[in-house]
Design a protein with these regions (language model features):
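Phosphate/nucleotide-binding beta-alpha loop and adjacent structural elements of enzyme active sites
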Residues: 1-206
């Protein structure tokens, strides 16, 4: 499993607890110093958890990440205007970014069961950085967030749908009672906070 935008590791910690007894390898990607220090301590005795102190993008390099406070869940590569929420992303730090296709090859990863990605509007760039590996033949499930951060990054839900469907996925919205597979419609591009799951066609056929 890939946890992209791991923050302080709460999601991966939940997966670890729910998968006790199973042979699952977790790869966490967290570029900010404070969060990475936290997950380094939290998972220091875990043999099947690999921690990576960089972010995912479509190019290798460096960038500035903005946040309102350390370990904020709003940390973003886009300096968002959050005046409506009485918040200001007035702190920043420089971080490393990497394409994940190179990482997959370096670590000889053969298959990814699940990707959770929550990087405040930068999801499409991260998907592009997977190259040929962001494909339904290589990845089973992808959980991603959509909302106001996509407005700031100028990324539409339509672009995410098109990118994923072209690569063999069906896209479902997370609802209170489960997943609801939906065809894209323009009215869905309302930038209201929601979570989606892309499901590999081969998984759906099982």
């Amino acid at each position: 499993m890939f946890d992209i935008g791991a923050n302080i590791g709460e999601y991966s910690e939940m997966i670890k607890e729910k998968s006790k007894g199973l042979d699952i390898d977790l790869y966490l990607f967290e570029p900010t110093k404070s969060c990475f220090e936290t997950i380094s301590q939290k998972f220091k005795n875990e043999n099947n958890i690999t921690l990576n102190n960089f972010g995912a993008s479509n190019e290798d390099g460096e960038a500035t990440i903005f946040y309102d406070k350390e370990q904020s869940g709003l940390a973003s590569l886009h300096q968002r205007n959050l005046d409506a929420y009485n918040l200001e992303l007035n702190q920043s730090e420089n971080i490393r970014l990497r394409r994940l296709d190179k990482y997959i090859e370096e670590n000889k990863i053969k298959h990814i069961d699940f990707i959770k990605i929550d990087i405040e509007g930068h999801e499409l760039k991260a998907f592009e950085g997977f190259g040929k590996y962001l494909d339904a033949s290589f990845v089973d499930y992808i959980q991603f967030e959509y909302g106001g951060a996509n407005l700031d990054s100028h990324t539409s839900l339509m672009e995410l749908y098109n990118f994923l469907e072209y690569r063999g996925f069906k896209v479902a919205k997370m609802m209170p009672n489960g997943l609801e597979i939906r065809k894209y419609s323009p009215f869905m591009d309302n930038f209201a906070y929601s979570n989606y799951v892309a499901l590999s066609n081969k998984v759906l056929k099982k």
